[in-house]
């Protein structure tokens, strides 16, 4: 198979391949970029594999960075772009089920492609656009299959994160998991506990917000992977609702909010759950706000102060979450009500703490409490947002 019209991300890198070829070495585009080219998906960057050793690449190109030279990777800076170029290699000994203990450089592309995770990622393309396919990756692309290269169990023992990558690719590409590969995940799911939470989280989020997440999540549950991640052990019955949803979350915050709701976590358990997954403080706050506002609109209509405290981003996220869960909510009415608020943040209020101090309010906690009272009064339409009305409100109430 030959590709004649390459997108710019490839044509810009062709001179790099040509220079390596002209120096007497083989060089190919490899991996996800070739897969995405064949699927007409957006390509972020390209990876290059070569028979040249790292020191030979450094002799060919003037500007290089030793990004992973021990494992055969050199970054080449060329025409304002950076390209990761990795020597053909084989790997052996995976005591931590993630990184190889030994890397051996080889001169054969086929040997290099053997170590890759799935057949659709074991494709290569030469400088003329010819596709090299030693493991029927093209056939699996046509069949929409995620299949491990060679024996699936071996691939997962080499890198247990590949089991999460399998369900992630299922979700992103809306492919099916090949039965033997699925069985190997079921047989080896315990190995996932050897992998850092951060890496598992990244794959889980990519799976959860992609268009095929319902089917992928079902496999995530059926194979036992869900038993090896923070907070999910023994919760299969709760999580089984996810594959039945009509829509997938499209943001990371809504994915976590959805998990919290399905798991029926009380509000005081949310911080611990989010930290178990090594989420940032900012993500933790964002998710807690969405869950709190979802609980609020599920019980009663929000007033102006509720909308003010939530903010537009949380309101929109919560509307999306309600749609995912099939809960009736008048989203446009909520947004319209928010847009009609007399103030939307602290800066919109014509006075601040300094104004209160100047008007005889003693410094201390009372200043903050009074500011909140004033905001509520403005939001509820009791007073106008001007200094005269606020001054009168203070004199009458304090």
From Swiss-Prot:
Belongs to the tRNA nucleotidyltransferase/poly(A) polymerase family. Bacterial CCA-adding enzyme type 3 subfamily. This is CCA-adding enzyme. CTP binds at residues 32, 35, 116, 159, 162, 165, 168. Homodimer. One of its GO terms (biological process) is RNA repair. One of its GO terms (molecular function) is CCA tRNA nucleotidyltransferase activity. PANTHER family: CCA TRNA NUCLEOTIDYLTRANSFERASE 1, MITOCHONDRIAL. Pfam families: PolyA_pol, PolyA_pol_RNAbd, tRNA_NucTran2_2. ATP binds at residues 32, 35, 116, 159, 162, 165, 168. Catalyzes the addition and repair of the essential 3'-terminal CCA sequence in tRNAs without using a nucleic acid template. Adds these three nucleotides in the order of C, C, and A to the tRNA nucleotide-73, using CTP and ATP as substrates and producing inorganic pyrophosphate. tRNA 3'-terminal CCA addition is required both for tRNA processing and repair. Also involved in tRNA surveillance by mediating tandem CCA addition to generate a CCACCA at the 3' terminus of unstable tRNAs. While stable tRNAs receive only 3'-terminal CCA, unstable tRNAs are marked with CCACCA and rapidly degraded. InterPro entries: Bact_CCA-adding_enz_type3_sf, CCA-adding_enz_C, CCA-adding_enz_firmicutes, NT_sf, PolA_pol_head_dom, PolyA_RNA-bd. Mg(2+) binds at residues 45, 47. It catalyses: a tRNA precursor + 2 CTP + ATP = a tRNA with a 3' CCA end + 3 diphosphate; a tRNA with a 3' CCA end + 2 CTP + ATP = a tRNA with a 3' CCACCA end + 3 diphosphate. It comes from Lactobacillus johnsonii (strain CNCM I-12250 / La1 / NCC 533). Its cofactor is Mg(2+). Keywords: ATP-binding, Magnesium, Metal-binding, Nucleotide-binding, Nucleotidyltransferase, RNA repair, RNA-binding, Transferase, tRNA processing.
């Amino acid at each position: 198979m030959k590709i004649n019209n390459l997108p710019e991300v490839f044509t810009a890198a062709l001179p790099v391949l040509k220079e390596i070829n002209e120096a007497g070495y083989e060089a190919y585009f490899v991996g996800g970029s070739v897969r995405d080219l064949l699927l007409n998906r957006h390509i972020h960057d390209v990876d290059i594999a070569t028979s040249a050793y790292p020191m030979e690449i450094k002799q060919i190109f003037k500007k290089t960075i030793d990004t992973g030279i021990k494992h055969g990777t050199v970054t080449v800076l060329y025409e304002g772009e950076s390209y990761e170029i990795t020597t053909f290699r084989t790997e052996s000994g995976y005591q931590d089920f993630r990184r190889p203990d030994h890397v051996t450089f080889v001169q054969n592309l086929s040997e290099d492609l053997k170590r890759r995770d799935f057949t659709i990622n074991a494709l290569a393309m030469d400088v003329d656009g010819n596709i090299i396919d030693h493991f029927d990756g093209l056939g699996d692309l046509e069949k929409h299959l995620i299949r491990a290269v060679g024996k699936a169990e071996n691939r997962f023992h080499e890198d247990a994160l590949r089991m999460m990558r399998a369900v992630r690719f299922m979700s992103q590409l809306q492919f099916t998991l090949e039965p033997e590969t699925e069985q190997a995940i079921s047989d080896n799911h315990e190995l996932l506990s050897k992998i850092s939470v951060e890496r598992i989280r990244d794959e889980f989020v990519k799976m959860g917000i992609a268009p095929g997440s319902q089917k992928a999540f079902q496999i995530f549950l059926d194979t036992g992977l869900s038993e090896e991640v923070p907070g999910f052990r023994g919760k299969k019955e709760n999580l089984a609702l996810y594959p039945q949803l009509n829509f997938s979350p499209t943001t990371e915050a809504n994915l976590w909010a959805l998990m919290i709701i399905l798991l029926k976590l009380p509000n005081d358990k949310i911080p611990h759950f989010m930290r178990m997954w090594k989420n940032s403080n900012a993500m933790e706050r964002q998710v807690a706000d969405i869950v709190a506002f979802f609980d609020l609109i599920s019980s009663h209509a929000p007033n102006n102060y509720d909308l003010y405290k939530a903010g537009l981003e949380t309101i929109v996220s919560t509307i999306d979450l309600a749609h995912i869960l099939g809960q009736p909510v008048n989203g446009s009415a909520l947004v319209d009500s928010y847009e009609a608020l007399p103030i939307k943040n602290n800066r919109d209020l014509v006075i601040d703490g300094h104004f209160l101090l100047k008007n005889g309010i003693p410094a201390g906690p009372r200043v903050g409490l009074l500011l909140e009272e004033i905001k509520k009064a403005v939001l509820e339409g009791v007073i106008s947002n001007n200094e005269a009305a606020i001054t009168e409100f203070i004199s009458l109430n304090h």
